[in-house]
Amino acid sequence: MPELELCVGVGSRCMDISKLSVSYHRAKVAVHMAIVQKKRVIKFDECGLFRLLYMVEDKGILKELEAECLAALEEHDRRYHANYVETLHAYLKHNGSIQAVASEMYTHRNTVLYRIGNIKKILGNELKTPEERLPYHIAFYIREMQGWIYE
């Protein structure tokens, strides 16, 4: 018999029954985050940036931001069978550490340097400052949310 895994999402505290539906929807967000983050229990209040993105009413703007940031790299990956999107994600996750990206991707650091150089050219962005990197961080958060943010 297969083992079942249970994930629990906890909504926000609700003192008024009229706010129950808000708490329920927040619990749904939390359970999706529990699944994504492979946690058994997660509270909506612990979902960080995902809380803010979930609250954006016009979900189309989230799709647009993701596309603006990642479409050129996705097209390059499709055309040349590269993995620049994955490389950028690792680069951002490791705060620009070439060695950490190389270790995670089982790739030589010179290969990572070459890819990052090309990524910067494709994006027209040096990715040096937090302000330059932020839209791409958010785009990856949005991507992680797809499949449930648009429900």
Residue ranges and their predicted role:
Residues 1-151:
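Cytosolic nucleotide-utilizing catalytic cores of signal-transduction proteins
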